[in-house]
C-alpha cells in the first residue's frame, strides 16, 4: 500500500496515514516517489503533510472529492462535452426598474427598511496589478475628487443603510464579511485598522481567507508538484465561488439566522456605483420573495457580459443562471433561434447582463448549503499542447464562480433578477489603460478612467432628475479612451442614500456648470437656490444642519491630462489619465452640532 513511502509511512500520524492511503487509492503514487529514508528531509516531509492536510480540509469533501471531480471534468473536457447539452434557453422572469419613477421609489424605500435584516459579503478580488496599481483593489480611490477608496465607499454605504433602516429605533449593526486571499489578507486588515474600520465597529467586520486548490498535471488528475520542490504541491486560486463554502464552514450564517437576519448580499470589489442600486434591488427581493435575485443591467446582443437565462432540460430540470456571452449565442442558435442572441424591440437583448451582485434569502441559502457543504459546480479550462488533448501546456486546476450557486437549486427555488440602467448600477474597474484603449469603439472601457467618470455622470443625472440644472457633458480623451466628462459631483452615502432623500435636500432654482466640482461631505446639507461655477466643498458633522444658497464663482479645479507612462505621477492618477489642478475653491467645515447658513 505505502511501498513508495517506505519506512516513512510508520512515522506518520494515523490521520496522515489515512490521507496517504486515500491518495494512493486515487492514483497519486507519484507524490511519494523517490522519497529518501526517514531522517533525511524530515522537515520538508512534515511541511508537505501540513500542506496536504490544509488542502484536504479546505475543500468540501476533501482531496478525494477534488480528485474525483477533476477526473470527471477533465474527461468531459477531453471529449468536448457541452455542459448545456439537453438544455433549451428561454427568457427568465424578473423586475426591470427605471430610476426615479414611482415603482422604483417604492422598491427603494422598502429596501432601506429591509436592510436591517441584511448582511453583506464583499468578494474581494486580488491586487490591482492588472490595473497598473500595486496596492489591493479595495484601497484604490473610486474617485479622486475626495480620494474615497472603494472599501470606504462600501462601508459608509452600509452604515448609511444601517442608520436609515433603524427609523429611530436602536441601530442594528449590519455585518460585513470580506473574503480575502494570501495576497490580500494582511493588507486588507491593515487598511481597515489604520482607518478605524472607516466608522464600523471592528466586531462588525469578519475577514475570511480563501485557500488555494491543488494543480493537476494531466487528464488522470494527478496532483502537480512544484518543479523545483518535490515536497510541495503547486496551487492556484479556485475562484470566487469559494465564498459559499467559506461562509458555510465558518458558522457565521447560523449566527446571522439566529439573530433574525433574512438576506445576504454578495458584491465585488471595484464598482463605485453599486450601492446606488442595492436598496431598490433589496426591495424587489422582499416584494417578490426571491430566494436568489441577480442584479443585472440591460445588455446589447453579443455584448461581452454574461446573460441571465432560464435553462430547461429535456428531463424536466430547470434553472436560472448566468450563461457566458460566448456560450449564449451558440446555445440559442442550437435551440431554434436561427439568429442567436439578437436585440428585441427595446434595443437590447432579452437576456439581461449579469453584473455578479447577488441577493440570497438566508434561510433558503442555509438549507441548500447544508446539502452541498457550499460546493459550487466547477469547471476546468486546461490549455492542451495539441489537438490530441492528451497533455497540458501547463498545470491546470478546478475553478468555480460565485454566480453559479443557482445551478444546484431545485426547480421550486424562486430565482429572479432586477435590471437597472447601466449608468446607475455598473461601472467596474478591471482593465488597465493600455487594454482599455484597445476596446472597440462603443464598448465599455471598464477602466479607472471610465469608472471615475461614471460616478460623476450618475450623480449629475440624479441631481438633474431632482430638479437641478446640470450642464451637459463634453467628450474628452484620457489614456486613449473617449469618455463623457460631467461636472465633478460627489456626496457621502449618508447624504444621498435614496432618491427621495436627495429630492428632500435640493430645492429652488439650482445650477451647476460643467467646469464645477461639488463635494457634499455631511448628511444634513440642504441646497436651495444655489448656483455653482467653480469648486465648492462642504464638510459637516452629522449633527450640523447646513443650508447652502447663493452663487459660488471661483477658478475651481481644472482637469488636466496625465500620461499613464509618466512615472513622475502617482499610480492612482496615471491609471486614470487625468488629475485635478486645485486652483481655487470655497471650502467650509462645520465640526460642531447646530444650524448653519452658508450664503455664497
Swiss-Prot record:
Q: Which domain of life is it from?
A: Eukaryota
Q: What does this protein do?
A: May function as the terminal enzyme of the myo-inositol oxidation (MIO) pathway. May also play a role in the salvage pathway for synthesis of nucleotide sugars.
Report keywords, A-Z. Nucleotidyltransferase, Transferase
Which Pfam families is this protein grouped with?
UDPGP
Share the entry's pH-dependence remark. Optimum pH is 7.5-9.0.
Catalysed reaction, written as an equation: a monosaccharide 1-phosphate + UTP + H(+) = a UDP-monosaccharide + diphosphate
Give the UniProt record's GO annotations in the biological process aspect: UDP-N-acetylglucosamine biosynthetic process
Q: What's this protein's name? A: UDP-sugar pyrophosphorylase 1
**Tissue expression notes:** Expressed in root tips, young leaves, flowers and developing embryos.
The Enzyme Commission number assigned here is 2.7.7.64
InterPro entries in the cross-refs: Nucleotide-diphossugar_trans, UDP-sugar_pyrophosphorylase, UDPGP_fam
The protein's GO terms of the molecular function aspect are: UDP-N-acetylglucosamine diphosphorylase activity; UTP-monosaccharide-1-phosphate uridylyltransferase activity
Similarity comment: family membership? Belongs to the USP family.
Q: Which cofactor(s) are needed, names only?
A: Mg(2+); Mn(2+)
Amino acid at each position: 500500500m505505502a511501498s513508495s513511502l517506505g519506512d516513512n509511512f510508520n512515522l506518520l500520524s494515523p490521520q496522515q496515514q489515512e490521507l496517504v492511503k486515500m491518495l494512493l487509492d486515487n492514483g497519486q503514487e507519484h507524490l511519494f516517489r523517490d522519497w529518501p529514508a526517514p531522517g533525511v528531509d524530515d522537515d520538508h516531509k512534515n511541511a508537505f503533510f501540513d500542506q496536504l492536510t490544509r488542502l484536504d480540509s479546505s475543500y468540501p469533501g476533501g482531496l478525494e472529492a477534488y480528485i474525483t471531480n477533476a477526473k470527471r471534468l477533465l474527461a468531459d473536457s477531453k471529449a468536448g462535452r457541452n455542459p448545456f447539452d439537453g438544455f433549451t434557453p428561454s427568457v427568465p422572469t424578473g423586475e426591470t426598474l427605471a430610476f426615479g419613477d414611482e415603482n422604483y421609489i417604492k422598491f427603494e424605500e422598502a429596501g432601506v427598511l429591509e436592510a436591517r435584516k441584511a448582511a453583506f459579503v464583499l468578494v474581494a478580488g486580488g491586487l490591482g496589478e492588472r490595473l497598473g496599481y500595486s496596492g489591493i483593489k479595495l484601497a484604490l480611490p473610486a474617485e479622486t475628487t475626495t480620494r474615497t477608496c472603494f472599501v470606504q465607499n462600501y462601508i459608509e454605504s452600509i452604515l448609511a443603510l444601517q442608520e436609515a433602516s433603524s427609523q429611530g429605533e436602536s441601530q442594528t449593526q449590519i455585518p460585513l464579511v470580506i473574503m480575502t486571499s494570501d495576497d490580500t489578507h494582511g493588507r486588507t486588515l491593515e487598511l481597515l485598522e489604520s482607518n478605524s474600520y472607516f466608522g464600523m465597529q471592528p466586531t462588525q467586520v469578519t475577514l475570511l481567507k480563501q485557500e488555494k486548490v491543488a494543480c493537476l498535471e494531466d487528464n488522470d488528475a494527478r496532483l502537480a508538484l512544484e518543479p523545483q520542490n518535490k515536497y510541495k504541491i503547486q496551487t492556484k486560486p479556485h475562484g470566487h465561488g469559494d465564498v459559499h463554502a467559506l461562509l458555510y464552514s465558518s458558522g457565521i450564517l447560523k449566527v446571522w439566522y439566529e439573530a433574525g437576519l433574512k438576506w445576504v448580499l454578495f458584491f465585488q470589489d471595484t464598482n463605485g456605483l453599486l450601492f446606488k442600486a442595492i436598496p431598490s434591488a433589496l426591495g424587489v427581493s422582499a416584494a417578490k420573495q426571491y430566494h436568489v435575485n441577480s442584479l443585472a443591467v440591460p445588455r446589447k446582443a453579443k455584448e461581452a457580459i454574461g446573460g441571465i437565462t432560464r435553462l430547461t432540460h429535456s428531463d424536466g430540470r430547470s434553472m436560472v443562471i448566468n450563461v457566458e456571452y460566448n456560450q449564449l449565442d451558440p446555445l440559442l442558435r442550437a435551440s431554434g433561434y436561427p439568429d442567436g442572441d439578437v436585440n428585441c424591440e427595446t434595443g437590447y437583448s432579452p437576456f439581461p447582463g449579469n453584473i455578479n451582485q447577488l441577493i440570497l434569502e438566508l434561510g433558503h441559502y442555509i438549507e441548500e448549503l447544508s446539502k452541498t457543504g457550499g460546493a459550487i459546480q466547477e469547471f476546468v479550462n486546461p490549455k492542451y499542447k495539441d489537438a490530441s488533448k492528451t497533455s497540458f501546456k501547463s498545470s491546470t486546476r478546478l475553478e468555480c464562480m460565485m454566480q453559479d450557486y443557482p445551478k444546484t437549486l431545485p426547480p421550486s427555488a424562486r430565482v429572479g433578477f432586477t435590471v437597472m440602467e447601466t449608468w446607475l448600477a455598473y461601472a467596474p474597474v478591471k482593465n488597465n489603460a493600455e487594454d482599455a484603449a484597445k476596446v472597440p469603439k462603443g464598448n465599455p472601457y471598464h477602466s479607472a478612467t471610465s469608472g471615475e467618470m461614471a460616478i460623476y455622470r450618475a450623480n449629475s443625472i440624479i441631481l438633474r432628475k431632482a430638479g437641478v440644472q446640470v450642464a451637459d457633458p463634453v467628450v474628452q480623451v484620457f489614456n486613449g479612451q473617449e469618455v463623457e466628462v460631467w461636472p465633478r459631483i460627489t456626496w457621502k452615502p449618508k447624504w444621498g442614500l435614496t432618491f427621495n432623500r436627495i429630492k428632500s435636500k435640493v430645492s429652488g432654482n439650482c445650477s451647476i456648470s460643467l467646469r464645477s466640482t461639488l463635494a457634499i461631505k455631511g448628511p444634513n446639507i440642504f441646497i436651495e437656490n444655489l448656483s455653482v461655477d467653480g469648486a465648492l466643498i462642504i464638510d459637516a458633522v452629522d449633527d450640523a444642519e447646513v443650508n447652502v444658497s447663493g452663487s459660488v464663482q471661483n477658478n475651481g479645479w481644472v482637469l488636466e491630462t496625465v500620461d499613464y507612462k509618466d512615472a513622475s505621477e502617482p499610480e492612482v492618477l496615471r491609471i486614470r489619465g487625468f488629475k485635478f489642478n486645485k486652483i481655487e475653491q470655497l471650502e467650509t467645515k462645520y465640526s460642531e452640532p447646530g444650524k448653519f447658513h452658508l450664503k455664497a
